[in-house]
């Protein structure tokens, strides 16, 4: 490999490392706002305290909930709804969603898990300030279920509705209806407020998703990096990351929102309104010493002035971050998926990598094979560039003696040296950066594949050969400590990939051979080993196979470049260097 190629690869590796550490796509984070710290309330055994009288308890409820106090007493009843994709548990206390277990996606230990973290109070709630100044959270109120069954099943295109009603008094009521479809992650959520025109202060209520999603992966630190609250309004994505346990993170913005959501690495819970919103509210906290981030994502909805009742419709999506699935919702929910820079890597991910992968998956079920085929296709596309690069490097090699003479002759005149070198490069048909051009062109693709492989659920828990999960490193041994840059494990795929990098350099024509090039021939594979050790195994597999195809391609080109082509190149180089050689002879005569 020539010096330019080595330098190009080294720069690429350096850029990748810096990019991963410091150059993550800028996120529109929530504004920091001062918030009073919440002290944990220690539960005291009931036997240790005297039970309050019924009158005292009623007075406390009335003081807290006002006219809604009567609804805060009741018996909780649950109903379990099962469709083709998940099993959900609804509660009459709050008419809320308490559990949702996916059927086709397991956690890192390959066991079913509940996505909803707020399983005690429930994830969904309506919040508002009553006309008498009471903060009302519907999860504190007992609804009446209109379904007598405790379990329901719906399949295929069938639909099933579960309704709850809360009669506040003779003129006011709240009705909440969930409608499930057998083959969909989408749940229709209908909220009817009857007779509330003068009961809600400010004519506004919030529909909240309370609680971050439970983590599903073994690597909790990595998943924590992907856990955010988000919203889409005004044509842009708002992201709030509660990354610092010492702060409370908030963002409150006005405008028309298409959705609010919370997500972990591979799953998302989103609320999509069907009428214009007043704005959004995001809130996030993280406990010190814990990787889990807790969020609230809320839509702010106005109560139409002059109306006594409102009937609002929402769509809930609680399920995998599958690009095609969330895009089919036509709500721009796919914008929550992190594919890097919108102007560079995201187009590669959305319009090249994912469509090709999805098309190939119709005929090939193993994603390891799909990655290999994809690497082969990319190599075919870059073949002309590689061929031109090889020919250019052979010419560069032939030019080395003359270039050294010119460097010696014009060592005190850099401008003249560059002028002469430029003339020779042009007349010889040489591009001095041709050696690294194919690699530079692939950089956006490689970065986009990094994002796709680490965040797309398509590769999750899909194996290939010894690799159990292509979306994470193929670790075969874990250390009791962590090595800087390398990590706390040994992965096989990066080792094989580094070996192919070495052989690719050995077989690639060098424009010049010096001590620096020899050092880089060993150093660069080591750098790539360190870099890829913590990358998804699928990405290392792609680069491994691309290198193998490159070695085969280079061997073929070395063997098939004809003597006539070599002679023509030599004549072109000789013609380009003739003026420099003539000048040298003329200097000797003097």
UniProtKB/Swiss-Prot annotation:
**UniProt keyword Magnesium present:** no
* Keywords associated with the record: Cell inner membrane, Cell membrane, Chaperone, Membrane, Protein transport, Transmembrane, Transmembrane helix, Transport
Oligomeric state and interaction partners are given as: Interacts with the Sec translocase complex via SecD. Specifically interacts with transmembrane segments of nascent integral membrane proteins during membrane integration.
Q: How does it sit in the membrane?
A: Multi-pass membrane protein
Gene name?
Answer: yidC
Q: Which InterPro entries match?
A: Membr_insert_YidC, Membr_insert_YidC_N, YidC/ALB3/OXA1/COX18, YidC/Oxa/ALB_C, YidC_ALB_C, YidC_periplasmic_sf
Which BP terms does GO give this entry?
A: protein insertion into membrane; protein transport
Q: Which cysteines are joined by disulfide bonds?
A: none
Subcellular location, in the record's words?
Cell inner membrane
**Which Gene3D superfamilies does the protein's record reference?**
2.70.98.90
The UniProt family comment states: Belongs to the OXA1/ALB3/YidC family. Type 1 subfamily.
What protein name does the entry list? Answer: Membrane protein insertase YidC
One GO term of the cellular component aspect? plasma membrane
Quote the function comment for this protein: Required for the insertion and/or proper folding and/or complex formation of integral membrane proteins into the membrane. Involved in integration of membrane proteins that insert both dependently and independently of the Sec translocase complex, as well as at least some lipoproteins. Aids folding of multispanning membrane proteins.
